[in-house]
């Protein structure tokens, strides 16, 4: 079976494990993009530690959950955003102002929309979490 969107699959796995009350989950396959998104989620406090485990194939991430995620998901298509248009996308994907975060890929790497707004750089939307 072909996996069309590994990021969406990873976020769905995390959301489902969070919903049934698990303390950890396994995300496969691993990629740099998924690792960068997990790092941003960890910095924002939505997940605990995560580690890469080499299984001889693509690898897996073992993620420790802390029970703070209500919903998370990938944003498709990957919309391009500028610094002035973050608020429009926050209204579309997040339930309230200053609640949750958009995860953005920029020329300076993957970061939250708060960090991108502070650095005054735009990019493409990858995911949302709240």
Swiss-Prot record:
Keywords for this protein: Ribonucleoprotein, Ribosomal protein, RNA-binding, rRNA-binding
Signal peptide positions (record): none
GO cellular component terms attached to this protein's record: cytosolic small ribosomal subunit
A Gene Ontology molecular function term of the record: structural constituent of ribosome
InterPro entries: Ribosomal_uS8, Ribosomal_uS8_CS, Ribosomal_uS8_sf
Stored NCBIfam families: PRK04034.1
Complex formation: Part of the 30S ribosomal subunit.
Name under which the protein is recorded: Small ribosomal subunit protein uS8
Native source species: Methanosarcina acetivorans (strain ATCC 35395 / DSM 2834 / JCM 12185 / C2A)
Originating gene: rps8
């Amino acid at each position: 079976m072909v996996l069309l969107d590994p990021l969406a699959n990873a976020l769905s796995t995390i959301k489902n494990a969070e919903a049934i009350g698990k303390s950890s989950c396994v995300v496969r396959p691993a990629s740099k993009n998924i690792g960068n998104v997990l790092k941003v989620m960890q910095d924002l406090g939505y997940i605990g530690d995560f580690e890469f485990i080499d299984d001889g194939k693509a690898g897996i991430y073992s993620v420790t959950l802390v029970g703070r995620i209500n919903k998370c998901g990938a944003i498709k298509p990957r919309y391009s955003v500028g610094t002035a248009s973050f608020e429009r996308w926050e209204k579309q994907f997040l339930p309230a102002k200053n609640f949750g975060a958009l995860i953005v890929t920029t020329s300076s790497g993957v970061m939250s929309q708060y960090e991108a707004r502070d650095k005054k750089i735009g990019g493409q939307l990858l995911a949302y979490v709240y």
